[in-house]
Amino acid sequence: MSEKMIKVTQVRSVIGGTKKQKDTIKALGLGRPNHKVEIKDNACTRGQIRVVQHLVKVEEL
């Protein structure tokens, strides 16, 4: 059984953000606006997304 996946798109820049927000964006595999990644949907990932929810858009696949 395959795990659920989500597509995360960075919609805003991290300029002016805190170090925690910048590190979280990098950990998610993002780095610039309009960059997209597909990652596994689990509690760890959801926690990271919550930290930068104002910078990203999340879509269920």
Swiss-Prot record:
PANTHER family: LARGE RIBOSOMAL SUBUNIT PROTEIN UL30M, MITOCHONDRIAL RIBOSOMAL PROTEIN L30. Part of the 50S ribosomal subunit. GO terms for biological process: translation. The gene is rpmD. It comes from Chlorobaculum tepidum (strain ATCC 49652 / DSM 12025 / NBRC 103806 / TLS) (Chlorobium tepidum). CDD domains: Ribosomal_L30. This is Large ribosomal subunit protein uL30. Coiled coil: none annotated. The lineage of its organism: Bacteria, Pseudomonadati, Chlorobiota, Chlorobiia, Chlorobiales. HAMAP family: Ribosomal_uL30_B.
